């Protein structure tokens, strides 16, 4: 297949981020300058975001058999780039106090962003696997970046070993799917499944193994055991990336796979996914109840959020509202998580050893950093799905999709899970307004709102509130991005 100028325009975000990786690498080799390399990374990610406008003008097209660039790919590419940009801005003040190599952090984030963009555009199982590896490998280094901290190193080793095992399951599953169908392309797989091949034991075994591999990457129950330890051990800016960009990119490609290859038509697959969704919602929320560490709490809550999204995925065959529900929910989850982890990053900067992730560190925050406490409150309310926040709109969509598809037991799980979640999110919010301890262990810088990370946190809070009250602009963007069904 010949690559035309139109194809190059469609691949602009991928090419720009790839070029930024090379530029930052050469810059580090030439001269170590933290500010310069952070600026280059942010400029590259912003340029990739702006280039999405030109991609939109070029229209939908297949670029090689591996990738399809369309509205859907643009939406998920945009979300991944926003998460990567936020990670870099949160990391800068954190790295200011870090005495080892600072610049490589941005290099690893850019390579992981490259993997996320590839996943958003993937239209083939080979591209899916390459994207997942490209996003996972830099995370091994990022999670263990504070390697002098025992917990960070332990989290990195744990994630590396389990991720390698999950990748082998995924690859073996793909091999079985290929052995039975003779295809790896999503569209060709869809045609094979349409010919009644879906009930072949080998194909079902292949999809089963793929669910194990992808379930690990998305930290769904029972493949979730790494999640709380890794979220707690990783530096706060890395936990931000882990909770947002990697989950969004992988869930996006799973949506596309289910869209073209209607795996959900198999009753066996639907039951397995339903049980995983139910267990993730209930278990994730129950485990978060007893947490006194904010990063662990957000780790367990991310398990339940992916469970909610899985409900929309199971209902995908019932109509295009599922696509809309996932897009809106992921946007709400992105901004809410960026705000919550952003506050933790600001409180933990500059690097002084362990992060400020104990719930006690946030007790009485309102009395000395009122705006920061207000931002954290908004994020907790949005994650809990309280009306007038973007989180509520996403949860409402998921419930509507579940009702439309008559998935009553999963709808009940969403309602019960949300009720449990309300308790621990409000527990964090209430602690912000209690009387402050006499001596502060950790505190955000006094001028935090003028830093790049502070601005990102404030914008996230504003978007969560504005789009929670008037979600139409976001819904319109998501509808434009889902003309596939």
Swiss-Prot record:
Keywords: Cell inner membrane, Cell membrane, Membrane, NAD, Quinone, Translocase, Transmembrane, Transmembrane helix, Transport, Ubiquinone. It comes from the Bacteria. The chain crosses the membrane at residues 8-28, 35-55, 71-91, 105-125, 127-147, 159-179, 203-223, 235-255, 271-291, 297-317, 326-346, 373-393, 408-430, 455-475. It catalyses: a quinone + NADH + 5 H(+)(in) = a quinol + NAD(+) + 4 H(+)(out). Its main location: membrane. It is found in: Cell inner membrane. It holds the Pfam family Proton_antipo_M. The keyword Thylakoid does not apply. Its EC number is 7.1.1.-. NDH-1 is composed of 13 different subunits. Subunits NuoA, H, J, K, L, M, N constitute the membrane sector of the complex. This is NADH-quinone oxidoreductase subunit N. The lineage of its organism: Bacteria, Pseudomonadati, Pseudomonadota, Gammaproteobacteria, Enterobacterales.
